[in-house]
Amino acid sequence: MRVLTPSLYIYAFFIFCVRFKCGNRTTVASAIRASYDMPPKELRVGDMLKKTSQPNCNYRTRGKCRKFFFVWKLDKMRDAHLGVQAKRRKNHLRSGSATYEASLGEHQLKGKRKESATNVEKEKKEKEQQEERLPVPKVGNKMPEKKPDWFHVPAPTGKKYNKLKEDLKKLKLHTVCEEAQCPNIGECWNIGTATIMLLGDTCTRGCKFCSIKTSSKPLAPDANEPFNTAKAICEWDINYVVLTSVDRDDLPDGGASHFAKTIELIKFSRPEILIECLVSDFQGNVDSIRKLANSGMEVYAHNIETVRRLQKFVRDRRANYEQSLRVLKIAKEINPMLYTKTSIMLGLGETKEEVLEAMSDVRQHNIDVITFGQYLRPTKNHLNVVEYVSPQMFDFYKEEGMKMGFKYIASGPLVRSSYKAGEYFMKSLVEQRRGAKTHAQG
């Protein structure tokens, strides 16, 4: 009868342990593959088969002991790993899924990240499909059948209207009231209020809602325009004036120097007059913004025109939503004493949620005043009106805006960015600030 050697007993015990711990696995390799989802770095067989320092392993039996202690170490590693996982799950229940996922290893999060990326792509695609279904304004599209009654305004007439028109023509000055075909021209001019348009009557941009003439190379600005503007304003019996301009991307500074010179001349002649300036974005040029912000004006205005989604359909490609908001923010940072102002046209296919989102973005950029008005198509060659927004909806946006913290909101079908209703309120705001400043200096 053959006697079994101790080495055979050890080997048989090793096979039993492998079968017991790893199911039907009969080799070391298959045992490794059934390693209870342990981290890859802990599965290096070379690390687990290093020379052991166990006291019962002498030189002859060291190799056999390694096999035994491999199973022993595998078991210990498995228990430790499961213990860590249990602790993580416990923390997950206490502090939420974000903490739990942050505690997981890279190999464990790989599947979740892949699934998360797929969900993000799916949501993005669904959002794009929803936006495609929303109406957008286009040149030549069908207009609403009938203009509501609240848009019927009387034709511009009156002595002041005629005198103002003659003065502007004599001094070769342009107004946005005429160029943009504003429906309030008769009302504003009869109380001696006009919005002077500087830098000529030709714009270098081609926004699809605007009726002002366009050209890539307009005539050079009139050098006498700042003097003529200051002369006209000083002759008129007004305390609040609005200056605006066309976009002049052909000029190095966008026309900022010309604009600033006009303001300085007006302030030199009549220091008490309040000036609001509706300016371009100057392509985001900080030096041009600084020049205007420090020129002496009280109100710095620049319009975002419409909600984020409709920017590419409504505005020139050189203008964008983020840049317009950034311009107003920079102006306020340069001169904190300025009031900043913007305007949004309604009726171009925007949704209520998009308008509220735009209002929130505007307020986050520390802009003080916002106005809302109905878009009206100047000619058949411009964007169509998607809808006529009701006066009740304009009132709703005004109420929501006041909750957001705007200092003033002008909201109505016929309201425009330089509408007189806003001027009265802005005048009182500026005078209050002036009084507070004088009191503090005294």
UniProtKB/Swiss-Prot annotation:
<dbReference type="GO" id="GO:0020011">
    <property type="term" value="C:apicoplast"/>
</dbReference>
<keyword id="KW-0808">Transferase</keyword>
<keyword id="KW-0933">Apicoplast</keyword>
<feature type="compositionally biased region" description="Basic and acidic residues">
    <location>
        <begin position="114"/>
        <end position="135"/>
    </location>
</feature>
<feature type="region of interest" description="Disordered">
    <location>
        <begin position="104"/>
        <end position="154"/>
    </location>
</feature>
<keyword id="KW-0934">Plastid</keyword>
<dbReference type="GO" id="GO:0016992">
    <property type="term" value="F:lipoate synthase activity"/>
</dbReference>
<keyword id="KW-0408">Iron</keyword>
<dbReference type="InterPro" id="IPR031691">
    <property type="entry name" value="LIAS_N"/>
</dbReference>
<feature type="binding site">
    <location>
        <position position="188"/>
    </location>
    <ligand>
        <name>[4Fe-4S] cluster 1</name>
    </ligand>
</feature>
<keyword id="KW-0479">Metal-binding</keyword>
<feature type="binding site">
    <location>
        <position position="182"/>
    </location>
    <ligand>
        <name>[4Fe-4S] cluster 1</name>
    </ligand>
</feature>
<keyword id="KW-0949">S-adenosyl-L-methionine</keyword>
<keyword id="KW-0411">Iron-sulfur</keyword>
<comment type="pathway">
    <text>Protein modification; protein lipoylation via endogenous pathway; protein N(6)-(lipoyl)lysine from octanoyl-[acyl-carrier-protein]: step 2/2.</text>
</comment>
<feature type="binding site">
    <location>
        <position position="207"/>
    </location>
    <ligand>
        <name>[4Fe-4S] cluster 2</name>
    </ligand>
</feature>
<dbReference type="GO" id="GO:0005739">
    <property type="term" value="C:mitochondrion"/>
</dbReference>
<protein>
    <recommendedName>
        <fullName>Lipoyl synthase, apicoplast</fullName>
        <ecNumber>2.8.1.8</ecNumber>
    </recommendedName>
</protein>
<dbReference type="InterPro" id="IPR013785">
    <property type="entry name" value="Aldolase_TIM"/>
</dbReference>
<feature type="binding site">
    <location>
        <position position="203"/>
    </location>
    <ligand>
        <name>[4Fe-4S] cluster 2</name>
    </ligand>
</feature>
<dbReference type="GO" id="GO:0046872">
    <property type="term" value="F:metal ion binding"/>
</dbReference>
<keyword id="KW-0004">4Fe-4S</keyword>
<feature type="signal peptide">
    <location>
        <begin position="1"/>
        <end position="23"/>
    </location>
</feature>
<dbReference type="GO" id="GO:0051539">
    <property type="term" value="F:4 iron, 4 sulfur cluster binding"/>
</dbReference>
<feature type="binding site">
    <location>
        <position position="177"/>
    </location>
    <ligand>
        <name>[4Fe-4S] cluster 1</name>
    </ligand>
</feature>
<feature type="domain" description="Radical SAM core">
    <location>
        <begin position="189"/>
        <end position="407"/>
    </location>
</feature>
<dbReference type="InterPro" id="IPR007197">
    <property type="entry name" value="rSAM"/>
</dbReference>
<comment type="similarity">
    <text>Belongs to the radical SAM superfamily. Lipoyl synthase family.</text>
</comment>
<dbReference type="InterPro" id="IPR006638">
    <property type="entry name" value="Elp3/MiaA/NifB-like_rSAM"/>
</dbReference>
<dbReference type="Pfam" id="PF04055">
    <property type="entry name" value="Radical_SAM"/>
</dbReference>
<feature type="binding site">
    <location>
        <position position="210"/>
    </location>
    <ligand>
        <name>[4Fe-4S] cluster 2</name>
    </ligand>
</feature>
<keyword id="KW-0732">Signal</keyword>
<feature type="binding site">
    <location>
        <position position="418"/>
    </location>
    <ligand>
        <name>[4Fe-4S] cluster 1</name>
    </ligand>
</feature>
<dbReference type="Pfam" id="PF16881">
    <property type="entry name" value="LIAS_N"/>
</dbReference>
<dbReference type="InterPro" id="IPR003698">
    <property type="entry name" value="Lipoyl_synth"/>
</dbReference>
